[in-house]
Each structure stands twice: as C-alpha cells, then as structure tokens.
Design a protein with these regions (language model features):
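Alpha/beta-hydrolase active-site loop
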Residues: 110-150
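Short glycine-enriched nucleophile-adjacent loop
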Residues: 167-178
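Alpha/beta-hydrolase fold nucleophile elbow
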Residues: 152-164
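The feature captures the conserved acid-bearing segment of alpha/beta-hydrolase catalytic domains
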Residues: 182, 188-243
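Alpha/beta-hydrolase
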Residues: 65, 95-97, 186, 247
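Short substrate-entry loop that stabilizes the transition state in hydrolases
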Residues: 57-59, 67-104, 192-193, 224-225
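N-terminal cap/lid segment of alpha/beta-hydrolase-fold proteins
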Residues: 25-57
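C-terminal catalytic histidine-bearing segment of alpha/beta-hydrolase fold enzymes
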Residues: 241-285
Length: 285
C-alpha cells in the first residue's frame, strides 16, 4: 500500500533529476527568503521551511504537505513549490511531519511496515488511516499554527495543498474548520485507494463535510484515477467553486505519473492552481 512501488520510485527519480539539473536551487532559496523553522507538535520538535516574498505583507499563505518520502527536506520539492507561489505573492510553509527529515518521532512508513509484518496488510491499512487523521494531521495543524503567528501573514487568506499522502492531509485538513480558505489536493490516495477500504470511506466522509473550495488534481497516468472518479463528482455537486481535473496525457512520461513526477513536474499544474486560488483568495476577506 505505502511501500516504494514504481510510482514512488518515479517521484524519487524526478526529485533526483531536479536536484542535479536545477542550477538555480540555492539562488532561489535566498531569493525567496528561505528560513528553517522548528516548532512543537505535542512533545515532538518538528522542522519546516518558511518562504516569503520581500516586504512586510500581509501576504496570503500556503501550507504545503509533503508525501510519504522519508527526506522531503533533502530534495528540491519545497524550493520548487516556493518558486511557484512566492512570485505570486504567497508565503509558503512546508512543515515536515514526525519522522521525516530532521523532525523527531517515528517515520510513518516504519510504523506501517511493522504493523503489516506483525498483523497483516489489513491491519496496516487501518493503522495508516488512523495515523493520517490523528498524529499526522496534528503535525500539519501545528505547522499551520506557525503560519498564523507570522506578522506578515494575512490569516484571512490561508490555503493548503500537497501531494500523495500530502494530498490526503490536504483533504482531511479541509474537512476541519481550521482557517483554510481553499485546498488543492494532488494525487490524493492514488497509491492507497485500491488496498484500503477504510481510507476510501474516510475520504468520502471528509469530502461530504468540506465547506471550502477544493481543486482536486491528478496526472493522467497516476497509480489510480478512481479517487478522482469517486470523490470528484461529490465535490462538484457540493460547491460550484470546486474543481476536479485529470490532466491530459502530454509532455514527458514521468511528468504524467504520480505527483507529476515530483518537483520537476510541478510546472504542469502551477498556473491552473494559481488561477484557482486567485478566484478564491485574490482579494482580502
């Protein structure tokens, strides 16, 4: 369900290629005022990266949720997200959940591997759903609290996005009344959908409760497009501002796969997402 299958390998390969070829990565970090931030989630000390436009603000802000990869902070993922949103006037905060990169706590994939080894795949699937909606979500919301404390952030214009496990996190957070104005889940549950009936039910429930605009996005060759076919119509039925898009099969093949191949494929969805967010948070509330 959560192991490094072909889709994840493609993402990691995309991150590696981007790391090798993005000569402007370090320059972008400075240009986007990148800061390493530590913060608490319960008793754990977590780490995140904060990016902001020049000037005092107040700016709209985006919380970016990474996937299940062990070391999201060691790739160009966050800098690439910043390269899309900071020039458009957004603060970006990328909290790293427990066990990822330099954040304290147990890595979720290690916990799931152990549960599956001891109790089987069904138990692993149930644990994944429970962790995603409890401790993992707690970590995201602790990151959101960091954003809300920044004096240069307009707390009336907060949005959330993320890919894969991060897409699931985005939907679960959108269900909560925590202050987000819009949500952009990308490749949400595409790798978990077929093998986890509990997660399918949980996400259907979440979608039925979401009251903020959602833009649900999938690449054309994602691991599974059934989430778009199941969750999409319900979203569109509930709110005329909601959007669902499976992108056309264009461009390099790896950018048509899970999470658009990672950092190198973010340009595929960037302009669509910015246009969607402009409609929702383009003016101060």
């Amino acid at each position: 369900m959560h192991r490094l299958n072909a889709g994840v390998v493609a993402i990691l390969a995309g991150f590696t290629i981007a790391l090798q070829t993005a000569s402007g990565w370090s320059q972008d970090s400075a240009r986007f005022n990148k800061q390493r931030v530590t913060f608490k989630s319960g008793s754990l000390t977590l780490v995140g990266y904060l990016f902001k436009p020049d000037g005092p603000g107040p700016f709209p802000a985006l919380v970016w949720n990474h996937g299940s990869e062990k070391n999201p902070g060691g790739s160009p993922q966050f800098d690439t997200v910043a390269s899309i949103f900071v020039p458009a006037g957004y603060v970006v905060f990328a909290p790293m959940r427990r066990g990822h990169s330099d954040s304290e706590g147990e890595y979720i994939v290690d916990a799931l591997d152990r549960e599956e080894a001891q109790r089987g795949d069904l138990a692993g699937a149930k644990l994944a759903t429970r962790l995603l909606e409890t401790s993992q979500l707690d970590d995201q919301l602790a990151g959101l609290a960091v954003v809300k404390r920044q004096p240069f952030v307009d707390t009336n214009r907060l949005v959330v996005a993320g890919c894969s496990y991060g897409g699931i996190q985005t939907l679960l957070a959108a269900e909560r009344n925590v202050g987000y104005r819009a949500a952009v889940p990308i490749s949400a549950a595409a790798q978990s959908w077929a093998g986890n009936s509990e997660l399918r039910t949980r996400l259907k429930t979440a979608v039925s409760r979401i009251r903020i605009p959602v833009f649900l996005i999938y690449p054309p060759r994602d691991a599974n497009l059934e989430p778009a076919r199941v969750l999409g119509p319900e979203l569109e039925r509930r709110n005329r501002m909601n959007r669902v898009k499976v992108f056309p099969a264009e461009g390099p093949e790896d950018e048509q796969q899970h999470c658009f191949g990672g950092a190198k494929g973010m340009h595929v969805w960037g302009s669509d997402v910015l246009a969607f967010l402009k409609d929702v948070v383009g003016r101060r509330a």
